[in-house]
Structure formats: structure tokens, C-alpha cells
Swiss-Prot record:
Binding locations of Mg(2+) 3: 462
Origin superkingdom: Eukaryota
Top EC category: lyase
UniProt tissue specificity: Expressed in the rind tissues of ripe fruits.
Main location: cytoplasm
This enzyme's EC code(s): 4.2.3.46
SUPFAM superfamilies: Terpenoid cyclases/Protein prenyltransferases, Terpenoid synthases
Pathway info: Secondary metabolite biosynthesis; terpenoid biosynthesis
PANTHER family: (-)-GERMACRENE D SYNTHASE, OS04G0344100 PROTEIN-RELATED
Functional note: Sesquiterpene synthase producing exclusively alpha-farnesene. Associated with the production of sesquiterpenes responsible for the aroma of the fruit.
Binding-site list for Mg(2+) 1: 308, 312
Organism, as annotated: Cucumis melo (Muskmelon)
Record protein name field: Alpha-farnesene synthase
């Protein structure tokens, strides 16, 4: 831990903490994208893309019953390749019919294992609370049923990711498939391509991976599959490249926006992570029609990240009380009560919210969304202040106290209301916004998963620089346990909360009629942090896998 000296209003000098955050690994790299020449429409490619799209639609709309396994494989491939947003109507129709057939048929137990697991996964992913009883017949005879068939084992493994609490057969399936796949990887006779595919699945199961990252990996893999659909690879490559150009244009704009505000220079104690912030937004929604949503989300993530660093690292407790009060009042006249660095931040915060409100003024629910975003920001200030008080006093809260705060302090409510604002008033009705701000169970499960994953990978670094106790310290002190044992327990809890995510996704779609598009943003938010915190704190220390992910989506081009 290091310190530096900064002036405060009464001219006394105060020694401040510093986390010595790494500089941005990107610097001004994406500002150069502003100078790129606009892409001229390639009419030949556009025509070819449209023809391929129509060809895929025809195959989805074919009605031959004997083709069901092939059609399910086609849907799975479309989803893995990240182009399912083009075929939502067709896929919804097919899976709705399939669900009806599945729950009324008495012969599903005779299915081939691959077909059964694929059908189960596709239906659960869609939000159908399909029974897992069909897996019961394999209990005690997994090896004889699957016999080291890699494709079947991968299908079983991916299906088991969508298990709920109490589904013991799927718990068994997960353990069996994982062990078998790990053995295949260790076998020196296994084809290297197969090893790569299995390793990818073991680290990044489809349900817990970001769709765009999944697509960037799977496009090359799918092209080599002997059973591939001939139209899909080219269509997926063209679509990926087209979207990438849009995303590059957006990151250039947002980089300039950040540069114009001068946050990196004026608030140099904070993390300069505007590129990573855009990657977060891209993870939550990548579709072309949600461009404005990504830009709004990135601005909120950026301004929220600085707020976190003020409370977490730089501000004195007395200054933080002033800032919390200023947030509650939400008025520029409050700036005169704040120290210089806070004044700059507070004015920028209010300006960003006003800027977003003006950008979205055409949307019917904008005033209500903006109001709820402000309320969520005020709430963040209050819980950040509680954490600052705990840190100042050296207090280790109980696990229950910690989780009550953690549900709020990760910012899920603010992020999700921002997502709804960007998605538009057709989806973001006042009723849906109220549902999100009530912190429904699916959002609570997501917040706990993200908080625990963050604590597991970052608690040592944070404790070294002086930080509020994490879940690890809370568990250790309350239960007199070793760090090793606590990490095992928290890992198991994360698995259980993923099961809650699956169950609540299905329940909310069927019983509360929340649009699938809204729930998908909650799921993508959880996937995002699963990716970011998989190998460490990929936001604070973004030079490793996070940089690789960003490069694959925003820098590297696919050969067409």
C-alpha cells in the first residue's frame, strides 16, 4: 500500500491511500478507430448474406418429423454461433412445439442419449421448466450408456449446467461427464482438435459463457464439423464481421467521450477502464439494434467505477459522508461543500445522467427509468459509506450483514435499470422496472454469484491495501475456519446459486410473464462476471485474459 497527499477544503494535508491501479492496457488505441474510413456497403456480400439467411430459415421451417434431431442440432449451432437473434421467431415456434410434444409424449425414455440431452438443454435455455426425470434411467450406469463418446459426453455436460437444486441425477451427470472429459484431455492419443474443444467446454460451458465470446471461438470449430450446415459458417462469419465493425465504431465514440471528460487525468487515482467498461456492456447485449443501450451502459459503468474507487480507496471518511449527502440531494449547488476532486466528479456524474436523459427523451418510460437510476446510485452511496465505516473501524461483519450489503454494492440494480432504459419503452415498462428494482430472486442470485466470485479472486490484493472485510474474512471469523475451507464452501455456494438462476429464469418466464429479453440481460450480466473473475480480477488487473477477450471481439478480424 502506498499513499499520496492531497489538499482538502480546510487546507490541511491528508495522507490518502492508493491502490496503485495499473494503467490502462489500451491507452488511446481505440481513439485511432475514429480515423477509419466508413465502410461502404458491399451489395454483393449483403445479397449473399440475405440469401444464406433465407436458406437457413427454410431449413428451420421444414416440417418433416424425422428431421427433429437434425433441426435441434441446427438450433444449437445457430445459438452457439451467435446468430440466433436473426431467427428468434422460428426458434421460438419450434421449441414451443417441441415442449408441447415432450410433456405429452410417453416415449421420451427411448431417446438416444444425445438427442435427449440436447432437447433438455434447449428447452431449459428457453425457459421451459422441463422435467429432468429422463436422466434417472442412467443413474448407476452412466459409463455403459455413454461409453466415452465425446459428442455425447459434451452434450451431457452442457445439459447438466442447467440443473436446479435437488436434481440429484443431473448432479451425478455433471460429475460423471466432467471426470470423463478430463480423462479424455489427459489421454495422449486424443486428437488435438478434440482436446481443444473439450478444454474450452470445461472452462467455459455454454450456459455460463458470453454469447459473443462463444461465437468467436465456435465459428472456426464449427466449420470443421463433418455434419455442419453448409449455409451457417459463412453466414456466421459475415454477421460477426458486420457486428464487429459496428462495435469498433462504438468503442471509438466512447473512448473519445471518456477522453473529453478527462477522467483519467483529473481523477488519476481511479481505474482507467473505459475499454473494459464497453466490454461489459457488449457482454450484456451485443445485438445491432441495441447500440444506444451499449453506449448508455458504458457511461454508467465508467462513472460508477470511479464512484467505487472514491469510496473504496481515495476519499477520507469525512469526505465520503459529504459525498453521500450530496448524492441524496442530487443538486449541483452541493458542489461547493465538496473537496476539489469530488466537485469535479459530482458535476460530471450529474452531467452524464442529464446527457443520457436527453439522448433518451423520445422514450416514454425514460423519466421513470432515470429516476430509478438516480435512486440506485444514491443507494450505492449509502452502502459504500457503510463499507467505508466498517473499514475505518476495522469491523468484520457477520456473513448475514455482509451479504445484505453485497446484494446492493455490486450495482446490479443500477446496471439492470440502465439496461432496461437502453432497451426501450416497449420492453422497459414501468411494471418491469418496478420488478427489477424490487431485487427479485434471479437478480439476488446473480448479485451473490458475482460478489462471491469477485471476493475469491481479489480479497488478498484488497486486504493488502486496507479494505473492508470480504466474504472470505467474514466466513473465517464467524465460523473459525481456514481460508482453504472457506474457499471450498464459497465455490459450492456459487454452484448452488447458479442452480437458482436456472430455476428462477424458468419460473419468472412462465409465472410472472417477464420478457425473455429482460431475463437474458440478467443472465448475461452473471455470465459477464463469471468470465471476468474466472482467472483473477479481470477488471482491476485487465492485462491478462480480459485483454485477450477484448482483442478477439474488437481487434482481431475473421477471415471470410
Amino acid at each position: 500500500m502506498s499513499s499520496n497527499i492531497s489538499a482538502i477544503p480546510n487546507s490541511l494535508e491528508v495522507i490518502r491511500r492508493s491502490a496503485q491501479f495499473q494503467a490502462s492496457v489500451w491507452g488511446d488505441y481505440f481513439l485511432s478507430y475514429h480515423s477509419l474510413s466508413p465502410e461502404k456497403g458491399n451489395k454483393v456480400m449483403e445479397k449473399q448474406t440475405e440469401e444464406l439467411k433465407e436458406e437457413i430459415k427454410r431449413e428451420l421451417n421444414s416440417t418433416t418429423k424425422d428431421e427433429e434431431p437434425e433441426k435441434l442440432r441446427l438450433i444449437d449451432s445457430i445459438q452457439r454461433l451467435g446468430v440466433c437473434y436473426h431467427f428468434e421467431y422460428e426458434i421460438n415456434k419450434i421449441l414451443e412445439q417441441l415442449h408441447h410434444i415432450t410433456i405429452t409424449s410417453k416415449n421420451n425414455g427411448d431417446d438416444h442419449p444425445y438427442n435427449m440431452t440436447l432437447r433438455f438443454r434447449l428447452l431449459r435455455q428457453q425457459g421451459y421448466n422441463i422435467s429432468s426425470k429422463s436422466f434417472e434411467r442412467f443413474r448407476g450406469k452412466w459409463e455403459s450408456s455413454y461409453d466415452k463418446n465425446v459428442e455425447e459426453l459434451l452434450s451431457l455436460y452442457e445439459a447438466s449446467q442447467l440443473r436446479m437444486r435437488g436434481e440429484e441425477a443431473l448432479d451425478e451427470a455433471f460429475r460423471f461427464a466432467t471426470a470423463q472429459l478430463e480423462a479424455i484431455v489427459q489421454d495422449p492419443t486424443t486428437d488435438p482438435t478434440v482436446v481443444g474443444e473439450v478444454c474450452q467446454a470445461l472452462k467455459w460451458p455454454m450456459y455460463k459463457n458470453l454469447p459473443r465470446l462463444q461465437a468467436s471461438h465456435y465459428i472456426g470449430l464449427y466449420s470443421e464439423k463433418p455434419w455442419r450446415n453448409e449455409s451457417l459458417p459463412n453466414f456466421a462469419k459475415m454477421d460477426f464481421s458486420k457486428l464487429q465493425k459496428l462495435h469498433q465504431k462504438e468503442i471509438a465514440y466512447i473512448s473519445k467521450w471518456w477522453d473529453d471528460y478527462g477522467f483519467a487525468e483529473k481523477l488519476s487515482f481511479a481505474r482507467n477502464r473505459i475499454v473494459e467498461g464497453y466490454f461489459f456492456a457488449l457482454g450484456i447485449f451485443f445485438e445491432p439494434q441495441l447500440s444506444t443501450a451499449r453506449l448508455i451502459m458504458t457511461k454508467i459503468i465508467a462513472i460508477g467505477s470511479v464512484l467505487d474507487d472514491i469510496y473504496d480507496v481515495y476519499g477520507t471518511f469525512e469526505e465520503l459522508k459529504l459525498l453521500t449527502l450530496a448524492l441524496e440531494r442530487w443538486d449541483k449547488s452541493e458542489t461547493k461543500k465538496l473537496p476539489k476532486y469530488m466537485k469535479m466528479y459530482y458535476e460530471a456524474l450529474l452531467d452524464v445522467f442529464e446527457e443520457i436523459e436527453q439522448e433518451m427523451s423520445q422514450k416514454e418510460t425514460t423519466p421513470y427509468c432515470i429516476h430509478q437510476m438516480k435512486e440506485a446510485t444514491k443507494e450505492l452511496g449509502r452502502v459504500f459509506l457503510v463499507e467505508a465505516k466498517w473499514c475505518k473501524e476495522g469491523y468484520t461483519p457477520t456473513v448475514e450483514e455482509y451479504l445484505d450489503i453485497a446484494l446492493i454494492s455490486f450495482g446490479h440494480k443500477l446496471l439492470m435499470v440502465t439496461a432496461l432504459l437502453g432497451m426501450g419503452s416497449t420492453i422497459a415498462t414501468q411494471q418491469i422496472v418496478q420488478w427489477i428494482t424490487s431485487m427479485p430472486n434471479i437478480l439476488k442470485a446473480s448479485a451473490i454469484i458475482c460478489r462471491l466470485m469477485n471476493d475469491i479472486v481479489s480479497h488478498k490484493f484488497e486486504q493488502e491495501r486496507g479494505h473492508v472485510a470480504s466474504a472470505i474474512e467474514c466466513y473465517m471469523e464467524q465460523n473459525y475456519m481456514s481460508e482453504h475451507d472457506v474457499l471450498i464452501i464459497l465455490g459450492k455456494q456459487i454452484d448452488e446459486f447458479w442452480k437458482d438462476m436456472v430455476e428462477n429464469y424458468c419460473v419468472v418466464i412462465t409465472e410472472e410473464e417477464v420478457p425473455r429479453g429482460v431475463l437474458m440481460r440478467v443472465l448475461n450480466l452473471t455470465r459477464l462476471f463469471n468470465v471476468i473473475y474466472k482467472d483473477g480480477d479481470g477488471y482491476t488487473q485487465s492485462h491478462g485474459s480480459t485483454k485477450t477477450h477484448i482483442k478477439s471481439l474488437l481487434v482481431d478480424s475473421l477471415p471470410l
